[in-house]
Every structure is written in structure tokens, then in C-alpha cells.
Amino acid sequence: MNNAKLQLPVCIILAAGYSKRLGQPKALLEIKGEYLINNIVKKLRKHDLEILIITNKELFDPINNSTKDAEVIINPRPEMGRTGSLQVGLRHLKDNFSKNFKTIVVPIDRPGFSNATISKLISLNSTSSPMKNGKGGHPILLSAVDISKILCAEPNIPLRDIIAPTRFEVNDNYLHLNIDTEDDVKLLLDYYIQDESNF
């Protein structure tokens, strides 16, 4: 990871869940001949962002072996949930790269954001997230102040109970896509067909 680029937000992709309801790893869903995780990495790299992927030990090898332009690390306790996974990534960045940085958090199962939304998040300094029709979505930009709050919290506490992002309205038609079922996977494929300009 390039320290010089840490003036830009660092992206943390959360991909440590076991996808029990879907029955297959969300990161390894195949989209146009590539894993979903690779599609998201490519999308973020277009903005010249550094990327850190947090995953579990079972998915580490397939993700690490197939994903370029990103660092991959293991969350040893993925059962603690997303906040715990995020803490693993934030501590890794603080310990190895910078004590003061912003980060864009991208859950693997919420890929329906546009390039315009990423550009907007990059331009902001306070903790912020997109919304569509008044409902909040992902990714979330975390300020350095809120990163400290998250690191001090218990790992099983939902992020919404720790921070309060400022929201901005976007036109992302698939912002609220949440990959959890086979029907959601069909919507994901529709998204990649209809919004090719975002990839």
C-alpha cells in the first residue's frame, strides 16, 4: 500500500461474512467471468484509491490469489460482525501506514453505488453516506474522529449505534441492493447489465 496516497481515503472492503443465507460466498459470485470482489476492486481503483480487503480464513486464498491491486487480510473472529471486521482493517492501517486517515467502507453485499457517489465521498471530510429517496445506503466515508470512536467500541455493536453519517441524495438506482438471496443475485446481474458505465 502506497503511503503517499493516504491523503485520499483508503477503501476497506468488508468480505468476512459466511453468507449462510445465500449459501455461497458473496465475494466469489461470478459476474461477467469475474468474481464480484474483483469487479468492486476495479471500480474503486479507477479513482486511484488504495484498497484493503477484510475476509475470513476460508476465503483468504481464493480472494488473495484472484484479486490484484488490493491488500487482503484475515479477520480471525468474523462471527463478531461487521464492526469487528472494520476494526481489524482500521487497526491494520493505523499500525502499518498512518495514524490519521479517512476511509471509505464498502460492504461486499452492497455493490450498487455509482462512480459519481465514490467521487462525492472522496471530496468530503466528515463522516458521510449516500441516500436514495430519503433512505441511507453504502459506501460510508469515515472521518478520522469517527474512526477513533469505532476503534474504542465493542466489536459486536452495530455501526449505526456508533456514528451518525451526514447523508447526501444520489441517483443510484441500485443503491439499496443488498445481496442476501438468489433473487438479489438476479438483481445484481441486472445492475451490471443496465449500468455498464459504472464499471
PLM-predicted stretches and their roles:
Residues 2-9, 152-199:
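Conserved alpha/beta core of the MobA/IspD/sugar-nucleotide pyrophosphorylase nucleotidyltransferase superfamily
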Residues 3-106, 111-130, 136, 167-172:
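Nucleotide and nucleotide-moiety/phosphate-recognizing core
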Residues 106, 139, 177:
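Glycine- and other small-residue-rich loops at beta-strand/loop junctions that grip anionic moieties
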